[in-house]
């Protein structure tokens, strides 16, 4: 018999359940209804339990995703150098919007229990994984169960429990009007600057231009209690050591990338000098 799923009222109720030590009563696939300024009611689905480590020190977490995207929007608008939008998650309009008016649209008690987490996303411009700290984010291709091949699909996080079986039907979403919809992922198409991964109405992976339209299927992580002044928060710039180490490694890699062209030029010049000296020495030996 199929397990009956439960619908909870608000993120604050989930936080209370965690706080009371009753995490076991929550199940993957359960839904949560929240009030929001984008729509009277938004529906969220539990896709992971203790799958994400919160940067504020929260010991137990529940990861949820929006299953009735309320708006159709672009991933990133056109700008200088990227007339059709850019597929980089970190500077995208989508990420800024999620951390801005979308986050602000929750009731205060629900917003207070959303905790910051660290997310990995491939950067086509830098040709490597970059890390961001977000309270609201989009899911990645690997997190929804698309197989990683280190080419078209990069490792941007383990599949959440809800998507582990690879069932396309679980990726099918309907918008707030009840219509099947495309929805954005944060994963770029790795070989260009404008293509972003999307999931189609059939649940299959696809891609679209960053300036095009898609459903905003936000995700977030709920902690055990409201963030208070005595807890570490991302906003206070006190991220975990691992995150800081990643940032340092990223900065070093950026510096190396900047230096490499000059080093290559110096090596080429040195090779030409050696070649010229060798040629002159050979000429003198013949004399």
Ranges and model annotations:
Residues 1-243:
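Collagenous Gly-X-Y triple-helix signature in extracellular proteins
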Residues 240-283:
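Short, low-complexity, charged amphipathic interaction modules
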């Amino acid at each position: 018999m199929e397990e009956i799923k439960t619908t909870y009222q608000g993120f604050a109720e989930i936080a209370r359940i965690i706080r009371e030590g009753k995490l076991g009563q929550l199940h993957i696939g359960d839904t949560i209804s929240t009030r929001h300024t984008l729509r009277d009611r938004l529906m969220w689905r539990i896709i992971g339990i203790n799958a994400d480590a919160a940067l504020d020190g929260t010991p137990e977490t529940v990861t949820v995703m929006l299953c009735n995207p309320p708006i159709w929007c672009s991933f990133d608008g056109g700008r200088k150098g990227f007339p059709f939008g850019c597929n980089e998650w970190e500077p995208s309009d989508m990420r800024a919007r999620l951390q801005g008016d979308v986050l602000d649209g929750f009731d205060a008690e629900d917003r207070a229990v959303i905790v910051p987490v660290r997310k990995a996303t491939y950067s086509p411009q830098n040709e490597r994984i970059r890390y961001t700290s977000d309270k609201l984010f989009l899911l990645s291709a690997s997190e929804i169960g698309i197989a990683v091949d280190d080419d078209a699909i990069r490792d941007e996080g383990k599949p959440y429990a809800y998507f582990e079986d690879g069932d396309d039907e679980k990726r099918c979403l309907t918008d707030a009007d009840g219509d099947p919809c495309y929805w954005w992922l944060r994963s770029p198409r790795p070989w260009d600057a404008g293509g972003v991964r999307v999931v189609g109405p059939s649940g299959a992976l696809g891609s679209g231009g960053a300036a095009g339209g898609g459903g905003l299927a936000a995700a977030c992580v709920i902690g055990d209690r409201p963030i208070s002044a005595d807890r570490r928060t991302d906003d206070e710039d006190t991220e975990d050591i691992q995150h800081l180490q990643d940032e340092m490694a990223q900065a070093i890699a950026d510096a190396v990338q900047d230096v490499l062209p000059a080093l290559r030029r110096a090596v080429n010049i040195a090779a030409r000098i050696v070649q010229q000296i060798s040629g002159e020495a050979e000429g003198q030996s013949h004399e």
